[in-house]
Amino acid sequence: MTSSTPTPAPAPEAQAVAARYARRDAAQDAQHYSLYASASALQAQQERLRTWVQLWRAHGWHNLAGLHFTEVGCGSGGNLHDLVRLGAEPQRLQGLELLPERAAHARATLPAALSVHVGDAASAAIEHGSQHAVLAFTLFSSLLDARFRTALAQQMWQWVAPGGGVLVYDFVVNNPRNPDVQGMPLAEVRRLFPHARLHSRRITLAPPVARRLPRSLVAPCASLLPFLRTHRLTWAVKPAQPS
């Protein structure tokens, strides 16, 4: 990371996020989100990746060479792996992760040239205007403090170069079974990035539904039942010229 004046983050919310993750059932998460074991997770990942590519190609990015990317909340590195497979250069990628054990897993599996940093992203030292894209996948829904969420979004927006953007993937409705998350409808993404041009797609068959389907029906139902899509992938673009 390059240096800039960091924006201090409210430590209590970062600590609260870590505590929420500690309460989760790690074994159940591993089963639900395994691309090998879960047909619904594999379908969701493939659909998300196709939509991601469509949004960026429509933006005029026909390849990713020479572009700089940061993922906030990179977890075990799955999206960073996808970026490498899409043609991004590892030395131009970095991940920020709050939880040390997840960051360690990412470092163990990602190319050595790719940097993974542990800590609170809101205080990360990243030069303003240095990133072509910042990724936030199921990040904002984990931040229940609206002021913290807004401050982090503003920080991420500062990192983005004109003509780049923030790629947000999150669910749009509240999960009544999980009080540790909050739905992120398009209106909230617009509030977080008020100066962005938003390009958004509704995707991802509701996971509780998808997990109950036979493997052969997951992809057809994801395509044919748009009213059961629970997530959005939104490309929030920073104008190349001030409006």
Regions found by a protein language model. Give the residues of each.
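Conserved beta-strand signature within the Rossmann-like core of class I S-adenosyl-L-methionine
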Residues: 163-170
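A short acidic, Gly/Pro-enriched loop at the edge of an enzyme's catalytic core
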Residues: 126-134
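Conserved alpha-helix/loop element of class I SAM-dependent methyltransferases that forms part
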Residues: 45-65, 82
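A short glycine-rich, Lys/Arg-flanked "PGG" loop and its adjoining helix->strand segment in the class I
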Residues: 150-162
